[in-house]
Amino acid sequence: AYQTDFQTEGFEKFELVYLGKGTADEYRNVDVKGKLVLVEINQREEWWINYPVYQAHLKGAAALIAVQSRGYAQIDDTALNAQDIAGPPEAPAFSMSRADFLKIQKLMKAKQEGGRTLPEITVEFDAETQVKKDQYTYNIIGKIPGSCSDSMILLSAHYDSYFEGFQDDNAAVAMIIGIARALIRGGYRPYHTIVVCALAAEEWGISDTKYDWSTGAYRQVFEARPDWPGHVIADFNFELPAHAHSTRDAVRCTYEYADFIQKFVDTVLMPEGIYPDGMTTLYPIETWSDDFS
């Protein structure tokens, strides 16, 4: 389930109808009131899940079930996906693996061959998902005092996660703690105070808004520690470090730091066997990680 409200209180029968990508054209002359709507979406190359979810909600559907087509589905057909919903809790949404979708698709085709005009079957659905508002999460910080106490360098990563969260982003939390431990064990005394930040609510933190991610980092800077702006000279934020993703590594930064970072990147000796195309500098920063705050 996504961050939405839906309770069946046990198994409940629904009609499940497949509507392609869930666009307005695919709803034409189709009554989905009280039904489960099954769609295929590609959140990387087309649109986010909130658009087909809200479309289904406005049409009176009981809920929408999303299957990732390409994009986030490329790891494995059995993989489930979950991201932030960027929408209201009363528009329920669920995730289904491609493997399960292909089984259901076969059943729907058999029904169509039997005379049904729409790809539709009857299913039993059991769901319990509830959004509890005004709950607490905690950002965890530690400091290595520098000789200049008025300036800070942040090492940040988020510890909230979907599923096991090893890649996104617990491996990064271990990295920043390991960096801090190495500095302390080595007896290094920094000039700038080093602040290690394990941040909450990066994946999702506010209901019923398009901007529901990176909440923990935003509130750390603008609410919990409003004294930080003007004193942080850099934030080194770490995301998805456990898997290479590509043949080339990259440091993403603001425009102002691009030349400085590139000079550093040019001096890095890449370990043998990883990133055969080396490392580069990308800019500007993206909204999809805590450093944007």
What are these regions (language model features)?
Residues 1-15, 87-142:
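A non-catalytic alpha/beta surface segment that caps or lines the substrate-entry region
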Residues 1-36:
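Noncatalytic luminal/extracellular "stalk/propeptide" segments of secretory-pathway proteins
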Residues 15, 32-37, 59-64, 119, ...:
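Loop/turn elements at helix/coil->beta-strand transitions in domains of secreted/extracellular proteins
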Residues 16-18, 36-40, 63-67, 92-96, ...:
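Structural recognition of the beta-strand scaffold that forms the well-ordered cores
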Residues 23-24, 42-46, 69-73, 100-101, ...:
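Solvent-exposed loop/turn segments at secondary-structure junctions
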Residues 32, 37, 53-121, 164-174, ...:
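Loop-rich non-cytosolic ectodomains and luminal regions
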Residues 91-93, 101-102, 149-150, 199-293:
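Metal-dependent peptidase/peptidase-like ectodomains
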Residues 140, 151-210:
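Alpha-helical metal-binding/catalytic segments enriched in His/Glu/Asp
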